Amino acid sequence: MDLKHTLRDLCMNPRHTRWVAPLLILGDAVLCALIIWKVPYTEIDWTTYMQQISLYISGERDYTLIKGSTGPLVYPAAHVYIFNILYHLTDEGRDIFLGQILFAILYLATLTVAMTCYRQAGAPPYLLVPLVLSKRLHSVFMLRLFNDGFAAYAMWVSILLFMNKKWTAGAIVWSTGVGIKMTLLLLAPAIAVVLVLSLSLGPSMQLGFLAVLIQVLFGIPFLQNNPAGYVSRAFELTRQFMFKWTVNWRFVGEELFLSRKFSLALLALHILLLGLFVATVWLKPSGSDLPSFLQRLIQRRYRTASLSKSFIMTAMLSSLAIGLLCARSLHYQFFAYLACATPFLLWQAGFHPILVYVVWVAQEWAWNTYPSTNASSLVVILSLAAQVFGVLGNSFSRKHLDQSSQKEHLQ
């Protein structure tokens, strides 16, 4: 009986995360070394990154003319600056082994920040175990060397900064992440709500302007040459994705997948879900409904709210999950953003620990199925839906976010 109680306490008591997390990270570091040693590297985009950087170093500043063997440069300027550094560190991209080591360090840094967020949000230790067991996540970082690793790191650092009320630093890091890959724009709705709740409208708009200014500063070398070309390539919102590479909507069939009606339906669903979350989940700390909140905000009668760390983390990760659920096409590297978010969102959905692990295993299987199938893509959608609608439904049933806040004060 004592053993059962001890094991339960070890798994459920947030106080244990302070020592469980370092042990898991240490074990994962060993696993990373084994993966680099034993599992062959797979070339996908690394060579293209290096070819594009070579053109940049040679003086090319027209984004439309920077290309590689697998296509044109389609990422914002911060991506160029980061991989310019990697280009020089890895002997123009030829030292793949060193590149893998650098990405392993990046992976462990991302994992460390994510676990810190979990601990500060009062999450139980059993949620940390899935964070170190994702085959696809290890692959994205160490075997594929995708730029998503840097964007995911920026995402988690910004979440941690926002959780600790470091608003300006959080906005800077988040905008830097957007400058690596546009995926981080999916967090923008939640960030806007969190900032307005915490700072009111004026200061929030100033931080929004700062985030935009950072993008302009990153892009200056390219904006001076061909501004339209830079914006259209780096921030292209109408890009068409090939059906054969999709991870999420394969089960709907190629004809529907490529149709404009399907694209518009997903956009409408995205807007609807964001509206529901704003009205029912994200505005809860304000103590008022959406019309009253907007009225007080416009009339400058709104009193700022003190947001719990768990609330901020839940808002930002649920905004991410909503965007991924409604995305027309997800590729395997998008798992860099989702992998560490899923256990926390399932917990905030109020799911039993066993169900948390069941959904996590199903999602992991789906994202490791290559090429994707009708079944695996359906599971991708269902697992994302479980996270989104789980958090939404739990906000109606009980004050789970408030309970999480209370746990923080007990730590």
Swiss-Prot record:
Belongs to the glycosyltransferase ALG3 family. GO terms for molecular function: dol-P-Man:Man(5)GlcNAc(2)-PP-Dol alpha-1,3-mannosyltransferase activity. It catalyses: an alpha-D-Man-(1->2)-alpha-D-Man-(1->2)-alpha-D-Man-(1->3)-[alpha-D-Man-(1->6)]-beta-D-Man-(1->4)-beta-D-GlcNAc-(1->4)-alpha-D-GlcNAc-diphospho-di-trans,poly-cis-dolichol + a di-trans,poly-cis-dolichyl beta-D-mannosyl phosphate = an alpha-D-Man-(1->2)-alpha-D-Man-(1->2)-alpha-D-Man-(1->3)-[alpha-D-Man-(1->3)-alpha-D-Man-(1->6)]-beta-D-Man-(1->4)-beta-D-GlcNAc-(1->4)-alpha-D-GlcNAc-diphospho-di-trans,poly-cis-dolichol + a di-trans,poly-cis-dolichyl phosphate + H(+). Disulfide bonds: none annotated. It comes from the Eukaryota. Keywords: Endoplasmic reticulum, Glycosyltransferase, Membrane, Transferase, Transmembrane, Transmembrane helix. Coiled coil: none annotated. This is Dol-P-Man:Man(5)GlcNAc(2)-PP-Dol alpha-1,3-mannosyltransferase. InterPro entries: Glycosyltransferase_ALG3. It is a multi-pass membrane protein. GO terms for biological process: dolichol-linked oligosaccharide biosynthetic process. The gene is alg3. The chain crosses the membrane at residues 19-39, 70-90, 96-116, 140-160, 182-202, 203-223, 262-282, 307-327, 341-361, 376-396. Residues 40-69, 117-139, 224-261, 328-340, 397-411 are cytoplasmic. It is an enzyme of class 2 (transferase). The keyword Isomerase does not apply.
